Amino acid sequence: MERVTLRIPKQQIEEVERMVETGEFPNRSEAIRSAVRDMLNEQVTDKRQRESTSKRGWAKV
């Protein structure tokens, strides 16, 4: 696993900390990994939907 260093606004990291404290995630790293996974999955889904829509055409009569 690669290490990545990033800056996150204080308000957002405080929200991540609350999620860890309430047991939603075991630690901050896992919370951030989960957010990245969700974002990537959403991007892939959106791309597939756009590709599917662009392949549709008018029915030949």
Swiss-Prot record:
The GO molecular function terms of this record are: DNA binding
Knockout mutant characteristics: Essential, it cannot be deleted. Repression of the cdrS-ftsZ2 mRNA causes slow growth and cell division defects and changes the expression of multiple genes and their products associated with cell division, protein degradation and metabolism. Repression of cdrS expression alone has a severe impact on cell size and morphology.
Any Pfam family hit? RHH_1
User: By its UniProt entry, which InterPro entries does this protein fall under?
Assistant: Arc_rbn_hlx_hlx, CopG, Ribbon_hlx_hlx
Q: Where is the composition biased (Basic and acidic residues)?
A: 40-54
From the UniProt record, give one GO term of the biological process aspect: cell division
The record's comment on protein family reads: Belongs to the CdrS family.
This chain belongs to the protein called: Transcriptional regulator CdrS
Q: Which organism is it from?
A: Haloferax volcanii (strain ATCC 29605 / DSM 3757 / JCM 8879 / NBRC 14742 / NCIMB 2012 / VKM B-1768 / DS2) (Halobacterium volcanii)
